[in-house]
From Swiss-Prot:
Keywords: Golgi apparatus, Meiosis. Its main location: Golgi. GO terms for biological process: meiotic cell cycle. GO terms for cellular component: Golgi apparatus. This is Meiotically up-regulated gene 112 protein. Has a role in meiosis. It comes from Schizosaccharomyces pombe (strain 972 / ATCC 24843). The gene is mug112.
């Protein structure tokens, strides 16, 4: 399935940034808090991937009202923000952008876009 290939490309891009064995913490910020769930955050990830990632539905993102934001942090050193624009049920992305210049792209995507920004974490993040 094409969507699963896109998600694998997405996960591979993240794994290149974070070394193996370290835990990736992911928080979902849906438009409405009651929609928060593992399925709404990562609908096409298998259980093996989900088990290696802490998923929670804490609070609404104050700066993103029409989009979902997936913030993944590795300890207190770096932060990945995945911003997903919803135009379709299928989660797709065209480009992953990191602040250090690393980028990854996926083909055949026109419904949804993800942008990942890699930046140091501050105390109030």
């Amino acid at each position: 399935m094409e969507v699963q290939k896109i998600w694998k490309s997405f996960l591979n891009a993240i794994s290149k940034v974070f070394s193996k064995g370290k835990k990736l913490r992911c928080t979902c910020f849906p438009k409405r808090k009651k929609e928060a769930s593992e399925r709404s955050c990562f609908p096409f990830l298998d259980t093996e991937t989900i088990s290696s990632c802490d998923l929670s539905d804490d609070v609404l993102s104050p700066k993103l009202f029409a989009k979902n934001s997936y913030r993944c942090s590795l300890k207190e050193t770096k932060c990945i923000d995945v911003i997903v624009s919803h135009n379709s049920l299928a989660p797709q992305f065209t480009e992953i952008r990191y602040t250090d210049g690393i980028s990854a792209k996926a083909e055949n995507t026109d419904e949804m876009t993800m942008h990942i920004a890699l930046a140091p974490l501050t105390e109030n993040q």
